[in-house]
Amino acid sequence: MKTIIAEKPSVAREIARIVGATKREEGYFEGGGYAVTWAFGHLVQLAMPDGYGIRGFVRDNLPVIPETFTLIPRQEKTEKSYKPDSGVVSQIKIISRLFNGSEQIIVATDAGREGELIFRYLYHYIGCATPFVRLWISSLTDKAIRDGLRNLEAGSKYDNLYLAAKARSESDWLVGINGTQALSIAAGHGTYSVGRVQTPTLAMVCARYWENRRFTVEPFWQLHIAADGGDGDTVKFSSTGKWKEMEPATVLYNKVKDS
């Protein structure tokens, strides 16, 4: 049997229909020599600091740089902490059984960096050794799926894509964990979230906000010209340039008027 893993149930359903896996089981479809299962986004994530024995925000613990990153099932937030998402844990068990009982895995997660990471993190977390190939398609038409299945590619072709995604994931963790803890400790109260993407984005929003708040109206001069466009129409033009002083605007105005 071969197992196909898609990134979400809707994609798995379309692929299952094409390969004849019409029998619905818990967490997958089966039939025609295939099992077609699915993730729902990232089922596996990098462990939080407490996974490395680091609890709370303590200055002496910074920077937090794990020698080796640990993978854990996706967590959900509770009132005081985080716990494994029960639905995710259940799906991982199903996928693990299918992967380890198959002769080959066909990776049908999204054709991109994150899609590759979703599968690889899951594959490594399970500790699977079953060989895998890549279904690389960007459309879910019947033709695209069939063509992709006829032209499966070696999984190793996308090793560098995985490494790029892994580097992004780990850098986000390092910036987020260390930045958040450092800023929160420095502030002395509350938790201040820092992120590789979210913090520069917030800075842009804040900068624009203060530009608007501090904006003061200043007079300027601009050229406006009206010309006969024919058939009784008037064509109006405005200069792209604006001047804070009247003199240079007047000089240009006279040049245009005299030309």
Region spans (language model):
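Intrinsically disordered, low-complexity regulatory segments
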Residues: M1-S169, W173-V175, G179, T240-K257
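Prokaryote-biased recognition of long, low-complexity C-terminal linker/tail segments
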Residues: A6, R168, D172-K244
